[in-house]
A protein has these predicted regions:
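Glycine-rich phosphate-binding loops of nucleotide-dependent enzymes
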Residues: 1-243
Length: 243
């Protein structure tokens, strides 16, 4: 895993006219993002991933500024996209190729790709995430939606990040897979990884996260922690009213 570091946002503005956000996310912390669709939580997550530019302020991990996706990855940030079919999987490629695309440089031996090293890496994450696939060279499209999502998560984890950004990670997966993923997320946090989870399901956020940032009109409308972590409180903040 990359060195543990704090993800910091200083006077971060995700849309013109919105209030700035100043936050830190510490190693081992799971922070949830909630809000009505289109109210800024997804843009905020993509800014943290270096996929979109903010209207103002900055994002840093340690002393490194995150100004692009490439810099985010190099600094120990991994991002799991929301729509696995459109922006995650490569549908014409195998399970193994989909897994290994982000770590090709780590599987090189004397300037040549080591297929054995690549397969060993895949098998390690296959076992950790309980990926069910007929064989590594099977098409990724032969897998269930839940197992496709596990392959994408394995791809992100193979980068050995310090910070994992998850965009609706259980969207469209079965209940059994959800609980496998929940256990994985908790284990990663226990090992010191910081996680930021955007979810369209409030109960999921409350189940997994230490605190919740609720977005409304492109800014953080509320930060909810401790005994206030209840569905009614989150929903009230989403609609701009008191709980």
């Amino acid at each position: 895993m990359a060195d543990r570091a704090t993800l910091s946002m200083r006077s971060l503005v995700i849309a013109p006219g919105a209030n700035p956000v100043t936050q830190t996310i510490a190693p081992g912390e799971i922070v949830g993002l909630a809000g009505l669709d289109g109210h800024g939580q997804e843009r905020f997550l993509k800014v943290l991933a270096g996929l979109e530019r903010p209207a103002g302020g900055d994002v840093t991990i340690g002393a490194r500024a995150i100004t692009s996706f490439r810099k985010a990855v190099a600094s120990g940030i991994a991002y799991l996209p929301r729509d696995r079919r459109a922006t995650g999987i490569f549908p014409t490629q195998s399970v193994l190729d989909n897994f290994a695309v982000s770590t090709l440089s780590r599987d090189m031996r004397f300037g040549l790709l080591s297929f054995a090293a690549r397969r060993r890496r895949y098998e390690s994450y296959r076992d950790k995430l309980s990926i069910v696939a007929p064989r590594p060279d099977a098409s990724i499209t032969t897998l269930s939606g839940g197992n496709q999502q596990k392959v994408l998560l394995a791809r992100a984890l193979a980068l050995e990040p310090a910070i994992l950004l998850l965009n609706d990670p259980t969207r469209g997966v079965d209940v059994a897979t959800r609980h496998v993923l929940y256990d994985v997320f908790r284990g990663l946090a226990a090992d010191g990884m910081a996680l930021v989870i955007l979810s369209s399901e409030i109960e999921e956020i409350l189940l997994l996260c230490h605190r919740v940032l609720v977005f409304r009109e492109q800014q953080v409308a509320a930060e909810i922690t401790g005994d206030e972590m209840k569905s009614d409180t989150v929903i009230a903040a989403m609609f701009g009213r008191a709980a």
